Amino acid sequence: MKILVVQGAGMNMRGKVQTEIFGTMTLDEYNQHILKYAAELEIDVEIFHSNIEGEVINRLYEANDQGFDGALVNPAGYSRGYPALTAAISQVKFPVIEVHISNPVRRGPVSDTATVSLGMVTGFGVLGYYLALRGLRDTRKGR
């Protein structure tokens, strides 16, 4: 099973700013935890980060063409007001689970991208990625 993990706009600032909301873990630390847990689940994971919406959209379409089995997307700064990203998520053949380190609903309306995602995991920090990986794996295996 091959899963794309997309880390959206501003994720490179995790652990550096707004630590009262997002904690002190950096993007690199999150990615290392994700890779380690995915290996335990025998899931092949590719992690992609960009602060440029078009690059994220292109990577999702490429993953679609490359036969990926699913994606975890932390839209971060792309959560609201990015209709092209929302459209891209709705157009790929594989399921997408949206992940947020914190609970964004506590700070405002739900994300636009969540409306086209299979599911959403919020507020559990790095554990949210673990839950989403397991959920995606089990959903794809029909469990």
Question: Model-derived features: where do they sit?
Answer:
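Extreme N-terminal starter segment of soluble prokaryotic enzymes
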Residues: 1-4
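Glycine- and acidic-residue-enriched helix-capping/strand-helix junction motifs
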Residues: 14-29
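Short beta->alpha junction loops
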Residues: 46-54
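Short acidic active-site motifs
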Residues: 55-59, 81
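Short, well-structured alpha-helical segments in soluble
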Residues: 58-67
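Short, glycine-/small-residue-rich phosphate/pyrophosphate-handling segment
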Residues: 105-143
